[in-house]
Amino acid sequence: MAAMTDVTDPSSVAMESATEKIIILPGHSADLTSVTFQIQKEDHTLGNSLRYVIMKNPEVEFCGYSIPHPSEAKMNFRIQTAPSTTAVDVLRKGLDDLIDLCDAVTEKFTEQLPRDTSTTMEVDG
């Protein structure tokens, strides 16, 4: 995962500068507690799982996403937070937490894989 750049001009922030994977759309609050991010080349797979993880954060008041059009490879992701944090910090934490969750699932799956390779499933036919 690419590191986010320092926030100097919030309207032009890119988390992955070479391809501008994540940008902040115009219309955000001045204190960055209410921000809509546009994430390129992502869909419901990331959107729903990231929304779920971010909503577990008690400082988040609202989190949702939309796919503007099925033929466009982009997702709009909205985060509104309490005044004690920013949507940018919440997004960073949410992405880190989602990576940790995926790593834990992969680890558990890998642990069980050798034990279950001899088990086959019979289908009545």
From Swiss-Prot:
Function: DNA-dependent RNA polymerase catalyzes the transcription of DNA into RNA using the four ribonucleoside triphosphates as substrates. Common core component of RNA polymerases I and III which synthesize ribosomal RNA precursors and small RNAs, such as 5S rRNA and tRNAs, respectively.
Protein's name according to its UniProt entry: DNA-directed RNA polymerases I and III subunit RPAC2
PROSITE patterns per UniProt: RNA_POL_L_13KD (PS01154)
Main localization category: nucleus
Protein keywords: DNA-directed RNA polymerase, Nucleus, Transcription
Keyword Cell membrane (UniProt): no
Pfam families reported for this sequence: RNA_pol_L_2 (PF13656)
UniProt GO BP: transcription by RNA polymerase I; transcription by RNA polymerase III; transcription elongation by RNA polymerase I
GO terms for MF: DNA binding; DNA-directed RNA polymerase activity; protein dimerization activity
CC annotations in GO: RNA polymerase I complex; RNA polymerase III complex
SUPFAM superfamilies (alphabetical): RBP11-like subunits of RNA polymerase
Family: Belongs to the archaeal Rpo11/eukaryotic RPB11/RPC19 RNA polymerase subunit family.
Organism from which the protein derives: Schizosaccharomyces pombe (strain 972 / ATCC 24843) (Fission yeast)
Subunit structure, interactors included: Component of the RNA polymerase I (Pol I) and RNA polymerase III (Pol III) complexes consisting of 14 and 17 subunits, respectively.
Subcellular location: Nucleus
